[in-house]
Amino acid sequence: MNLKSPKLFLSLIIVLVYGNTIFNSFHFDDIHSILEKPWIRGWDKIPQFIVSVFQRPLVILSFNLNYAISEFEVWSYHVFNVCFHIIASLLVFKLVQQIMFFLKDLSAKKYPPLFSWPYIAALVFALHPLSTQSVTYISSRSSILATIFYLSGLILFFKGFGERKFNKNPGHIYFFGSTFFFVLGGLTKEIIVTLPAALFLFHYYFISRESP
């Protein structure tokens, strides 16, 4: 294994930790959210839920895709959750990279990639017990997806200001992308409503202040 590829290393660790959950059965809310929900049983059902914000349509759409792959065989639902968790963890890696870039505290030359702060932060996020339910409990997929959109919005927000500061580019496309992910989050889980406040705080602490 190439230890200079922290993203690959992180992904493999997550697979090793959560790989034994792939055949865990449906539980609790999975019954009425998946097994008893007719909306996931075919692409023709998409128009019935895709316009309903209150039904978290993107989550249902992902279950619809699972049903197309394996119907009610549980393995594909768990594989999706693990893959989404890997994506979220890699986004944490990217976000902390951008924060450190603005703070100018770390550099690739000073710290090997495997031991960098971005990797440590992503590893803590990936393996922390608080993440367990969101990964192993299929109905908690809404939390993982909302986290992906949340982090993507933050990353593009940073990228937009990075373009302004270092490349003299207005960065409008990145700010539009951040807004787009905010909308996707709204179709996934209500926690996304805090994203504008997070953007304000990130701008205040990491962008508007000049590093010493």
For every predicted segment, state its role:
Residues 1-212:
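Polytopic membrane enzymes that build or remodel cell-surface glycoconjugates and lipids
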